[in-house]
Amino acid sequence: VRDAYIAKPENCVYHCAGNEGCNKLCTDNGAESGYCQWGGRYGNACWCIKLPDDVPIRVPGKCH
């Protein structure tokens, strides 16, 4: 497990405006919790706590 930005299949983050949607997205994917990271490296994006290793995360490189 790891703490990371959860990613869409094309290596794009899930942008957010609040914590509720991110917490649901993260927990639905097996994480302990999640929140909206404001003004982070990828803008306002969902950050998951203890996300399972089989769920894609944002990695260096382009979002396409």
Swiss-Prot record:
Subcellular location(s) per record: Secreted
GO cellular component, one term: extracellular region
A GO term, aspect molecular function: toxin activity
The LCN-type CS-alpha/beta domain, residue ranges: 2-64
SS bond list: 12-63, 16-36, 22-46, 26-48
Predominant place of localization: secreted
One GO process term, biological-process aspect: defense response
InterPro entries associated with the record: LCN-type_CS_alpha_beta_dom (IPR044062), Scorpion_toxin-like (IPR003614), Scorpion_toxin-like_sf (IPR036574), Scorpion_toxinL (IPR018218), Scorpion_toxinL/defensin (IPR002061)
Keywords: Disulfide bond, Ion channel impairing toxin, Neurotoxin, Secreted, Toxin, Voltage-gated sodium channel impairing toxin
PROSITE patterns in alphabetical order: LCN_CSAB
Tissue localization of expression: Expressed by the venom gland.
UniProt record similarity statement: Belongs to the long (4 C-C) scorpion toxin superfamily. Sodium channel inhibitor family. Alpha subfamily.
The protein's name in its UniProt record: Alpha-like toxin BmK-M4
Species whose genome carries this gene: Olivierus martensii (Manchurian scorpion)
